[in-house]
């Protein structure tokens, strides 16, 4: 599954948020300037953060799962955490 988010956070901020969020949950598998990869018992996950026109960053989170799994729930939760870095008052309401 692929999940997308557009944010005003910088690519560096997004990747630091990913390290904090996934670092205690999954094993790091890959790290480049704009991409992080993780793996665990639930599957593989990659996060990429690319500068987009203007002041935005395009965030893509991809899992190797075909349907909504526990890993996909983590991916969606992470995107809400990215949103919270820009808007600290953001309240996460999803059941993930």
Q: Where does each model-flagged region fall?
A:
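Terminal, regulation- and interaction-focused segments at domain boundaries
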Residues: 1-28
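Conserved short-loop catalytic and cofactor-binding motifs
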Residues: 2, 35, 59-62
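Residues in flexible loops and secondary-structure boundaries
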Residues: 9, 13, 30, 46, ...
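A general marker of short, structured functional hotspots
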Residues: 17-18, 34, 92
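Intrinsic disorder/low-structure terminal segments
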Residues: 20-21, 37, 77
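Short, hydrophobic/aromatic-rich segments at coil-to-beta transitions
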Residues: 30-38
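Beta-strand/loop substructures that line and gate deep hydrophobic ligand-binding cavities in soluble
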Residues: 41-96
């Amino acid at each position: 599954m692929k999940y997308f988010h557009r944010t005003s956070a910088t690519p560096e901020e997004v990747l630091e948020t990913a390290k904090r969020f996934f670092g205690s949950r999954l094993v790091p598998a890959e790290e480049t300037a704009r991409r992080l990869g993780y793996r665990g018992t639930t599957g593989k996950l990659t996060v990429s953060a690319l500068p987009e026109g203007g002041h935005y960053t395009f965030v893509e989170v991809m899992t190797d799962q075909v349907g909504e799994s526990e890993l996909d729930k983590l991916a969606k939760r992470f995107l809400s955490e990215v949103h919270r870095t820009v808007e600290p008052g953001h309240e996460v309401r999803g059941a993930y």
